[in-house]
Amino acid sequence: MISISHYRLFYKVKLAKLTTKEKDNAINEVRILASINHENIAGYKEAFFEQGSSSLCIVMEYADGGDLQTKINQHKKTMQYMKEEYIWSIFYQMVSGLFALHKKKIVHRDIKCANVFLTKKGTVKLGDLNVSKIAKAGVMQTQTGTPYYASPEVWKD
């Protein structure tokens, strides 16, 4: 369930219906969000457990401009190009958010347009950190994220 107020996004994760790995991912997202405060990362406000529905409830900053995938689809539908300055602004802010994550050794692992949120004022917010991981040492061995966005070298026959 998702509920939106003017400044915050509230969503429930029904834990009873999730696998152990999915539960771990939900809790991991809360931990990571709570550890970072950056203007280009979707802001975490609070999380709590709701006994009645056995749900993890997460309150997040609301990006009132939707996501980048929707914005791209709207431009395609109307056959309009996005202005180059706008594209560079989005790119710069995405890199700024990723840099903030990487400084804390957090790897997003699911970067795609649907996980890049926008405000009406033009601020970019990276979100959906549920498969993110804190890098311990060396190269991560697990493959995760959205398969169609995976680089060719991670595809296996």
Predicted segments with their positions:
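Conserved short submotifs of the Hanks-type protein kinase catalytic core
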Residues: S53-D67
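AlphaC helix of the protein kinase catalytic domain
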Residues: Q69-Y81
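Conserved N-lobe beta3->alphaC-helix segment of eukaryotic protein kinase catalytic domains
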Residues: K12-I36
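A short, aromatic-enriched beta-strand patch in the conserved N-lobe beta-sheet
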Residues: E46-F48
